[in-house]
Amino acid sequence: IDKSKPIVYLLPTNSVTDQLALRMSTKALGLPSPTETLTLAGREYSSTLFLRKTQPLFRSSAKDTGIEDVFTDLFHLHRDHENLDLQVVPVYVTWGRAPGRGKPGLSDLIADKAAPSWLRKLFIVLFLGRDNFINYSKAVSARAMSNQHGSDQSIAHKLVRVASTHFQRKRQSMTGPTLLERQELNNSVLGSDAVRRAIAEESRSKKVSHEKAKETAQTYITEIAADYREGLIRFGDRLLTRIWNKIYNGISVGHADRIRELAANGHEIIYVPCHRSHMDYLLLTYVIYHEGMVTPHIAAGINLNFWPVGKMFRRGGAFFLRRSFAGNKLYTAVFREYLELLFNKGYSVKYYPEGGRSRTGRLIPPKTGMLAMTIQAMLKGVNRPVSIVPVYIGYENVMEVKSYLNELKGSKKKKESNLQVFSAIRKLKNYGHGYVNFGEPIALNQFLENHVPNWRDCRDAEPEKKPAWLTPAVNELANNVMTRINRAAALNGMALASLCLLSSKRQTMSEAELKQAMGDFMDLFKAVPFSDDATIPDSSAEELLRDTLKLGRFDVKEDDYGRLISPQPKSAVYLTYYRNNILHLFAIPGLIMASIFAKKGTTKNSIFQLIAALYPLLQKELFLHLTQDEALAHTDALITALLNKGLLRQESDELLPPDAHCKQFHSAWLLSRCMQETLQRYAVVLTILDKEKVISRSALERESKQVAERLSALYGLSSPEFYDKNVLSSFISALKENHWLDSEKDGSLKYSEECEALRADVMALIWPEMMQHLENVTLNASN
């Protein structure tokens, strides 16, 4: 909205309370008042226009506002006065978010439906006055419309029609579709062809009556389905606002305009966030609600369906799914039909592609079941365009981090219970900042067109028959989702300080060194952004460090030379979780500096060769979004920035570490060490392959884990994922996929000449003492 140009506000109805709310809002925002008279070319107009009047109390239809004539007159003014440019700003004012029900009831009396009568509006404001939301849409230039479409009445009619559709979509995006009654839901799911066939199959295979099989299906839909209550959402909003104010210093939201635009264009929105904590369920829903969007139906693990939390989650829009559908065709059919019903009715949905919470802080390889069911729903025909929205969620303090690390060390996962809930509430404290970044949406229709041009032909195929292209397409989609999540990463103080301290030799740094390093790294990412979607704090390094120290994760000791900062006793291992949240941002700069420090200087071409060799492996492990060519171009840009920032120096063709007396030297040294554990893990696997030459995958994973555990004990590595079997398995898969390994007829893995060259590159980058120990450990193991 350009405040220097005249503005007219366009509202759906001429409600007095809406106008009063708008007046208060414009005053707070410094915008022109909607009650002022607007003078254009010597003529006076109202600053507020309405599509229709409110519903009369005793008549079925409202009177016309004559808005088409007003717009026609305004367009004529623009035709006659070339310098005139009026901005039309659509404003949607809502009270509450009740979507209404299929069967009208008393609650509908206060549902803010289109053009309510003054009496209904009185009740609405009386009961929902605190739940007022005012949404300003992008200003529309009357000059641009007049120049492009002319100035006759047909254009005014078109503008009114488009505005009416816009407000309908705006309402839909804020309240969602009308809620299904339980009986209607049951009839829709249990009466579908797929579920009827599954019931018949259950009856035959289990040798039970048709009624018994149908009762089982009824039990499943009762177990699965959400029971959305808008009143609980409003109550939760007030409660969570108090909790967030208590435990968070703020919540940063990035790129929310993307989801608002999708909703305005009538898209079915599927949110696919990373999963760090149980807090994700609440935080993302809270953010979406405060962005003026309807809260989604959320896929939650059946482990959360315990009294009373399960009932509260269900009323907040959660639907529950089992960890495995294997072997239960009836459950699969019921769940799939319920999910398709949500899509077809227009409910936004949220599910976690990782399947569970990350215990290491890095993204987990995705579980593809929900994505596969989403595509299968597309095959059956979803009426609206479907967009998948990856979401990055980050915290400066995760309440479960201690239990995560215990699980990584072998402890059994504790079952969720009321005791855990009350314990978590009791421990609520300063959790720093929360971050929610909406990544680049994936238009599912377009994705299928690009990868499977004939996908629509499968709509007439048998519903239970899986197309041959489905699995590859789902795997590609899943990888796309994960890379877009990481692409939208949020750099924060806790993660940055953790990365610096864990990269230092004794996990202790002076305050000046830590501040310098944090500032240097932020400057580097500002000069060469990791992506357009990644966010960097606006704070200075000094402010960021000060706020980070308040989180209570660090010891600060002071001597005659200044303050020393280190992790609290035995808590360095916790910092690995926060470091891993952002480690993928440092993959390429870390490799560049590791090569330069290890070789005490190298050429740009040598660095390019190293990146070309290692990037495909890092890309799979860390879900990096750049292609190989883009990674090399990014490397070139980073080298230039590192030189400009004093983190590198150049002599002739050789790139060298900065001079030891330079203030940036310590930052450069830390950067060279931040990828060491990853490289050391690679070295473990490659050295075992070198010694064995041919080895089964299971034996390779087992021996790699044993050697990594030993090295971790020898060097005091504080990172449980260093020997995590899933991380090791992911690296071995990447070696196979990139043809570094050959396969024998029995499936064993064979060390190749190409793999030997890769091992040489990796071994040149790890610490010499680590390389020596690694050689000795594997040699002793083979003897």
Regions from the PLM with identified roles:
Residues I1-N783:
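Membrane-interfacial terminal anchoring regions of lipid-handling membrane enzymes
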